[in-house]
Amino acid sequence: MQFHLNGFRPGNPLIAPASPLAPAHTEAVPSQVDVLIVGCGPAGLTLAAQLAAFPDIRTCIVEQKEGPMELGQADGIACRTMEMFEAFEFADSILKEACWINDVTFWKPDPAQPGRIARHGRVQDTEDGLSEFPHVILNQARVHDHYLERMRNSPSRLEPHYARRVLDVKIDHGAADYPVTVTLERCDAAHAGQIETVQARYVVGCDGARSNVRRAIGRQLVGDSANQAWGVMDVLAVTDFPDVRYKVAIQSEQGNVLIIPREGGHLVRFYVEMDKLDADERVASRNITVEQLIATAQRVLHPYKLDVKNVPWWSVYEIGQRICAKYDDVADAVATPDSPLPRVFIAGDACHTHSPKAGQGMNFSMQDSFNLGWKLAAVLRKQCAPELLHTYSSERQVVAQQLIDFDREWAKMFSDPAKEGGQGGVDPKEFQKYFEQHGRFTAGVGTHYAPSLLTGQASHQALASGFTVGMRFHSAPVVRVSDAKPLQLGHCGKADGRWRLYAFAGQNDLAQPESGLLALCRFLESDAASPLRRFTPSGQDIDSIFDLRAIFPQAYTEVALETLPALLLPPKGQLGMIDYEKVFSPDLKNAGQDIFELRGIDRQQGALVVVRPDQYVAQVLPLGDHAALSAYFESFMRA
């Protein structure tokens, strides 16, 4: 990380100086805001943490509960989510505290000893090279803690307003400044019944499956239920089951159980299949107790013992997959130039719900907000046209439907009994195979956005085949030329709203002044059509909107910084300090770590990889196609 840009400042560099633009936190909610976020779950806090980086955007986040979450609910953190946490600069802390999921084992009835279970398979949880981060497990409350700390340490010093419930949301599309009016009711004992009104430019409902914001804009969760009750419990238990510290899927004659080891080395989560429900029956009517969950888990684990000592948290739920047709207040099914601009959005469980079996609920919700946050910031800061906001619903609804389809099949296979002989059910081998085949999806790296205003046509994909247009930027190791430090290239991308331009030089670029990379630098630095010149505000650092990074195919010892264009060594900040962290080489020291080979980059021609602020590849272009680069940004950015 970089700091001391504008002079030496002692103390923790992760605590940004408080901005004079940010108002002090008050007990009462502000009367007017740019963005009102409803809900302090994963979706709401991801959005709040991202917007907190911009003190010129007035953000307010409210929550119905009276304080931060302390226990329970989601715990799985996918590889893709860890990549996002790196952008928020707390991935390392999560890695130290979390439980890493390395292998998954599969158990079924022992054909040699009826009534007992036996291990029949083992697979690696995520395939090699899928991400630089593992799949980990950590209590959702601790994830919230990291986001809250990020917000407190931001230039905005953003903090939630708790104990507020949404009563009403009204939209006046004729109002120019603050078209959305939200009525809140305070629900803590000291202020019960007090009414507050907030006017906002935009409202985002991250208030869960029973979202009041969703209801206010007339959206509905549509889908079905599997009519199957499940229980979930976090336990401290003594057991002789040998795989209790692995992720385990058990299909037995007594039912089905999913075991998830938790952080700390002792805590374990059990998902326990319970009763089949009648049509239209709610799980609450069964009055299932934690004692029943424990007894069922003990029967499924036979002949192994399970002595539960403590249950910090437990719950019951029914499997269901539901989704909204759109994630904003615009009535048109497909936005047109005549469509009104969206003013109210929904994210996370407010717009899609599914079973927890694949561990995607919290992860997918955070990706919703990561998609929306940079777009709101770009529009509010007048960097992009407001029509950009239509892409939130169009991008996220489609991939959520893909998740629903996967989850429906996965949950069904998990609930079906293990097939034995000629009897019905699911073949345990097919169950294991399905898990392996969909590993990219469960790791969170399977999202693929279709061509659109933001996503190119992939006409030049062959120049960098491993950076698929429309998918997340798949990081790889590099060596920084200025100090020979090995690092991950993707970790240059922070949650700061900036675009990344990764320019991979051709083999002969260093020796040829008219080469693709050097010509690109001249174009970006001085041409009137350059996006850097057109869209970077006057007086700001040259990389404040577009962060250009160069990667040469030669070893770092063969790249002379003093011969490179000034754009790759830009002066920045009040003191004009040089940024020495823009130039990289592949890791040629360790076999199999060359980024050009790993990501299929054309070593002769090179390539320009354009990456969105949410870490998704927007374009792969030839280094010399300056017109295409300009046309892309001109389609949605404002000068």
UniProtKB/Swiss-Prot annotation:
Swiss-Prot/TrEMBL keywords: FAD, Flavoprotein, NADP, Oxidoreductase
E.C. numbers: 1.14.13.23
Coiled-coil boundaries: none
Catalyzed reactions per annotation: 3-hydroxybenzoate + NADPH + O2 + H(+) = 3,4-dihydroxybenzoate + NADP(+) + H2O
Taxonomic superkingdom: Bacteria
Swiss-Prot/TrEMBL cofactor(s): FAD
Gene Ontology molecular function: 3-hydroxybenzoate 4-monooxygenase activity; FAD binding; protein homodimerization activity
Name of one Pfam family that matches: Phe_hydrox_dim
InterPro entries assigned to the protein according to its UniProt record, in alphabetical order: FAD-bd, FAD/NAD-bd_sf, Phe_hydrox_C_dim_dom, PHOX_C_sf, RIFMO-like, Thioredoxin-like_sf
UniProt-annotated binding residues for FAD: 34-64, 73, 166, 212, 269-271, 317, 349, 365
UniProt function note: Converts 3-hydroxybenzoate (m-hydroxybenzoate), and to a lesser extent p-hydroxybenzoate, to 3,4-dihydroxybenzoate (protocatechuate). Also acts on a number of analogs of 3-hydroxybenzoate substituted in the 2, 4, 5 and 6 positions.
Quaternary structure and interacting proteins, as annotated: Homodimer.
Family: Belongs to the PheA/TfdB FAD monooxygenase family.
Name of protein: 3-hydroxybenzoate 4-monooxygenase
Phylogenetic classification of the source organism: Bacteria, Pseudomonadati, Pseudomonadota, Betaproteobacteria, Burkholderiales
Gene that produces this protein: mobA
